[in-house]
UniProtKB/Swiss-Prot annotation:
GO terms for cellular component: membrane. PANTHER family: TRANSMEMBRANE PROTEIN 164 (PTHR20948:SF2). It is found in: Membrane. The lineage of its organism: Eukaryota, Metazoa, Chordata, Craniata, Vertebrata. The chain crosses the membrane at residues 40-60, 93-113, 116-136, 142-162, 172-192, 210-230, 262-282. Residues 65-85 are annotated as: Disordered. It catalyses: 1-(1Z-octadecenyl)-sn-glycero-3-phosphoethanolamine + 1-octadecanoyl-2-(5Z,8Z,11Z,14Z-eicosatetraenoyl)-sn-glycero-3-phosphocholine = 1-(1Z-octadecenyl)-2-(5Z,8Z,11Z,14Z- eicosatetraenoyl)-sn-glycero-3-phosphoethanolamine + 1-octadecanoyl-sn-glycero-3-phosphocholine. Keywords: Membrane, Transmembrane, Transmembrane helix. Residues 72-81 have a biased composition (Polar residues). It comes from Homo sapiens. Its main location: membrane. This is Transmembrane protein 164. The gene is TMEM164. Belongs to the TMEM164 family. It is a multi-pass membrane protein.
């Protein structure tokens, strides 16, 4: 008989989820909404999410074809690297090491507390995307991931503004929570400053923002909700609202669908604007702090 049976595997995945903590899971959390309301919300949101994905993909593919055709005789755009871009910079390697250490400690906490299932939450998935972007050389796949994750950062803002930390009891577990969510902003801003292949869509274009919105809602109302109902684990608050949710109540998912659509569509644009303004501002401050050169006779 195998040492790790099916039951022990399930215990390893979510056996440490304690339903006595508010908003963590359990039968009461799973029954927070009636099945009729949950089904109706899921059908409506999943339908809208699929429409958003299809519309966004249609416009993205059309734009890709137009860019590929270009002027007569032109060649499709290729992802090229300048010689200096091919070399891994020290700052990029340090950021990759810091992110891997932070996420590695977080994964260790999940194993130690038998809550590995929480690694399916969006913030952890975006962290994995950032590790991929820092480790992988620029290519078409990396550019797609970069443009998608730019509009998946609103979860980090919510986690910082309305933290759910009542289950983080191990030493330094709380600190890792904040460090990881701050790093979710550091990596994309660094890649924007680095430039090169990692160029966001124009501020006036919302194709990738719409695609990210559709993918996020589809993931929440399909994968996370189904797994949450089966395991009675409140994955990213799909079963019941968080204790810090300002819209706590039976309609919290309707409110969340509205404000998260707005945030997903606009938050990434604000991050891009901030990166554009922060670069010249930092350069200006450094110039002010720089000591004047001594005149040599």
């Amino acid at each position: 008989m195998s040492r790790y049976s099916y039951q022990s595997l399930l215990d390893w995945l979510y056996g440490g989820v304690d339903p006595s903590f508010a908003g963590n899971g359990g039968p009461d959390c799973a029954a927070f909404l009636s099945w009729q309301q949950r089904l109706l919300e899921s059908v409506v949101v999943l339908t809208l999410a699929l429409l958003e994905i299809l519309v966004a993909l249609r416009h993205i593919l059309r734009q890709t074809k137009e860019d590929g055709r270009g002027s007569p005789g032109s060649q499709p755009e290729q992802v090229t690297q300048r010689p200096e871009e091919g070399k891994e910079s020290l700052s990029k390697n340090l950021l990759l090491v810091a992110l891997c250490l932070t996420f590695g400690v977080e994964v260790g906490f999940k194993f130690a507390t038998k809550t590995v299932i929480y690694l399916l939450n969006p913030c952890h998935l975006v962290t994995m995307m950032h590790i991929f972007l820092l480790a992988c050389p620029p290519c078409r796949g990396a550019i797609v991931v970069f443009k998608l994750q730019m509009h998946m950062l609103n979860g980090a803002l919510l986690a910082l503004l309305f933290p759910v930390v009542n289950t983080r009891l191990l030493p330094f577990e709380l600190e890792i929570y904040y460090i990881q969510h701050v790093m979710l902003y550091v990596v994309p801003i660094y890649l924007l400053w680095k430039g090169g292949a990692y160029t966001p869509e124009p501020l006036s274009s919302f194709r990738w923002a719409l695609l990210s919105t559709g993918l996020m809602f589809f993931y929440h109302f399909s994968v996370l909700q189904i797994l949450g109902l089966v395991t009675e684990v409140n994955l990213n608050n799909m079963l019941c609202p968080a204790i810090s949710d300002p819209f706590y109540g039976p309609w919290y998912r309707i409110w969340a669908s509205g404000h998260q659509t707005l945030m997903t569509m606009t938050h990434g644009k604000l991050v891009i604007l901030f990166s554009y303004m922060a670069g010249p501002l930092c350069k200006y401050l450094l110039d002010l702090l720089r000591l004047p050169a001594k005149k040599i006779d």
